[in-house]
């Protein structure tokens, strides 16, 4: 946290992808210099290490069905702690991430929208309960996803036995259009 950060400064959670790390996200994103120049704080949390030694966010992948870690609770508690400890803005706390971190952003929007004011997922989709049980108040979202992504396919894959079935990005965007009561234009 920069020493010169004003009270009520924004806070951004920036989450790594599957097998990634907080340090890797810090180095990859270049976000810290942007935060320092623009007066906001960035939190680079580390996910849990799974049975294969890989870091992950628990978003409902098929091969993590035996995992019981509640990352929504962990990140919500961490947000409250950082807001209180460093006088950061509860109204301006946001979540973003890459791939599995993006999928965790969706989980936070669905199940901790009272702690996170907006999300900006990059190259991720909605899995498991974020897709089947998400019911929230409208929340701003900036979705970034390439059509040539060969890991999280643009068109989705309802037969994926590795990650688990997931919808295409058109369906995900339509879901958020409905959730946020947007008008098509």
Region locations from a protein language model:
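Single-residue recognition of alpha-helix boundary sites
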Residues: 27, 112, 156-160
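Short, surface-exposed basic-aromatic patches at helix termini and helix-loop junctions that form
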Residues: 36, 110-114, 134-138
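Short, flexible active-site-adjacent loop segments at beta-strand->alpha-helix junctions, enriched
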Residues: 46-48, 99, 125, 147-148
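Serine-hydrolase catalytic machinery in alpha/beta-hydrolase-like enzymes
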Residues: 6-94, 98, 104-107, 111
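A short loop-to-beta-strand scaffold at the N-terminal edge of the catalytic core in hydrolase folds
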Residues: 1-3
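The feature captures the conserved acid-bearing segment of alpha/beta-hydrolase catalytic domains
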Residues: 117-185
């Amino acid at each position: 946290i920069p020493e010169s950060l004003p009270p009520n400064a924004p806070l951004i959670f920036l989450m790594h992808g599957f097998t990634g790390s907080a340090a890797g996200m810090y180095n990859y994103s270049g976000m810290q210099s942007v935060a320092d120049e623009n007066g906001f704080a960035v939190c680079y949390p580390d996910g849990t290490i799974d049975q294969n030694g890989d870091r992950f966010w628990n978003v409902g992948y098929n091969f993590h069905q035996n995992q019981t870690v509640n990352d929504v609770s962990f990140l919500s508690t961490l947000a409250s702690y950082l807001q209180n400890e460093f006088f950061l803005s509860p109204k301006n706390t946001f979540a973003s991430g890459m791939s599995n971190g993006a999928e965790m952003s969706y989980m936070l929007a669905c199940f901790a929208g009272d702690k996170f004011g907006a999300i900006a997922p990059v190259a991720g989709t909605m899995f498991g309960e974020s897709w089947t049980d998400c019911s929230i108040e409208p929340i701003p979202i900036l979705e970034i996803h390439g059509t040539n992504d060969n890991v999280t396919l643009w068109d989705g894959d309802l037969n994926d036995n590795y990650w688990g079935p997931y919808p295409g990005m058109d369906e995900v965007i339509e879901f958020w259009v409905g959730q946020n009561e947007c008008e098509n234009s």
